[in-house]
Amino acid sequence: EMTRDLRKIARKYPGKTGLSSLGRTYDNREIWCLRVGNPSAAKKLVIDAAIHAREWKNTQVIMRQTEEILREYGEHRARFRSTCLYILPMDNPDGVTISQYGASGIRNAKLRKKIQKIGHFNTWKNNARGVNINNNFPAGFSADKKKDKKKGKKRKPDATTYTGKKAASEKETKALISFIKRISPKTVLNLHSTGSILYWDFDVSSPLHEKQYRLASEIKKRNHYRMMPKSSSTEEHGGFADWLVYEKKI
């Protein structure tokens, strides 16, 4: 349904949008990217959703917002000459399928069998290999592995917490990394569900810290979300945001 809607949008607004795939998942689903605006613009903004499978409601939100933006495109034509939006409505399409339909939604027999053994579909966050994509990025990943080893923890594929054998082991992670490196965006907004909070302070030095504070403050003015303290933003590593901040300085 999302793929159909994206193609419909791209056909309806051919001069304003561009639809492309960042790659395919383990169950052969596309990771779609919809460009809105001038691809040569100096300012590039990425908005992504559903990196955690059970948070697929954000996909519906981002799709609706995209349609609203395009309907009002004419009023902001000058802005879109200098700014380009890249909409990633579903980072984890395999996981979303599992969250919505259980193991039966997965077409690959080997993957489906492993997923059936894991269960917990109503709380499923991970991809089709039972890996949490949002803890699979190369930013503090090895440090967390060392902590687990010290505590004697042996993790394996599951519905919510498994981070993978190594950093960037997953197709979805690699696709996101490759995409960010290719377009070098100024800002990335990573949408999640529940909490009504903003994770923004990753204990980095200025001017990046000041930029993050300004952006979070502007968002707070509009949605009244609570800005979380530094300690809450640095408890876990290997996240998409961790990698964006520490490795790409975004």
Regions found by a protein language model. Give the residues of each.
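Short glycine- and acidic-rich boundary segments immediately preceding or forming the N-terminal edge
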Residues: 1-27
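Surface-exposed patches in mature extracellular/periplasmic domains of secreted proteins
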Residues: 18-23, 74-83, 227-232
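Proline/glycine-enriched tight loop/beta-turn segments at coil->beta junctions
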Residues: 29, 38-44
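Short, well-ordered beta-strand micro-motif
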Residues: 33-35
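Short beta-strand element of the alpha/beta-hydrolase
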Residues: 42-52
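Active-site/substrate-binding loop(s) of hydrolase catalytic cores
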Residues: 42-43, 56-202, 208
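Active-site neighborhood of phospho(di)ester-bond hydrolases with catalytic His/Asp-centered motifs
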Residues: 48-49, 88-90, 188-191, 224-231
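Catalytic cores of processing enzymes, dominated by hydrolases/peptidases
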Residues: 165-166, 197-250
